[in-house]
Amino acid sequence: MNNNHVYDMLVVGGGPGGYTAALYAARAGLDTVVLEKLSAGGQMALTEQIDNYPGFEDGIDGFSLAEKMQKQAERFGVRSEYAEVLRMDLTAVPKLLETSEGIFRGKTVVLATGADPRTLGVAGETELLGRGVAYCAACDGMFYKGKTVVVVGGGNSAAADALLLSRVAKKVILVHRRDTLRATKIYHEPLAQAENVEFRWNSVVSALLSGDRLTGVRLRDTVTGEESVVDCDGVFVSVGRQPATALAAGQLSLDKGGYIVAGETTETSVPGVYAIGDVRTKPLRQVVTAVSDGAAAVHMAEVYLAEAGR
């Protein structure tokens, strides 16, 4: 590897946003590399079935879609490197990324590092992913049409997920560790009026029950310690997300949740650095919105490079 080589664009993260940015950059003639620590696709690659991404009338699994996105970008000359970014200097000229595979330098940086859903931390949770355990109601809700589901959480995301699921599921059981929702008041009345939404206050999930698939949950009362079993077909874990922004802290503006502050232009507080997909502040985190961000970031990077004469 030539550590002195300067790329036009360094893309950190090989999810749908990252590879879309790389595709657009390569087609614009920008020398581009994608740095991914695991495998292409990010969280999308773990999704068993994606039915809300345009162009696939029968849906597609996340791994296959990720593979297609990577191959499409590489067809136009994008380089993929499997490397973990260990340190970033985003104000250096050129910008510098220290990785497990060496130093990378670039004129611009696109951060597509994503956000991981916070988990319940109970046994079997990982094994039941896609077999009854889900983290995205907008993605997987339709698989539970006419069924009974549990939503875990008490914030805005949990309330919104419960409302969305109440339109398709036979019954929604909202489980929260406190005796009232943390969600903003706008959600309280619609949830209270929904005839198929039931609340389990002062409760946490202590165990997942399953055969080949999830069959129910065991709840523990946080006040009395008593346990009970709830039969259900699915559990939606809506206890927040953890954005992968540790390396950006102190260099970029972050909101109180740790997300990189960036609007629809994807521009961050440092010129030439762009945040796309789940890692940035935004109202909706989906594959299609990450892809849109990737295209926008390249457009803004082209403007930046032209104005800077780079």
Label the model's feature ranges:
Residues 73-93, 97-98, 103-104, 166-263, ...:
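A Rossmann-like FAD-binding core segment of flavoenzymes
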Residues 119-120, 159-160, 182, 227, ...:
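Glycine/Thr-rich phosphate-binding loops of Rossmann-like dinucleotide-binding domains
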Residues 3, 7-76, 159-184, 255:
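Beta1-alpha1 glycine-rich phosphate/pyrophosphate-binding loop at the start
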Residues 80-143, 154:
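Glycine/small-residue-rich loop that forms an oxyanion/phosphate-binding "nest" at active or ligand-binding sites
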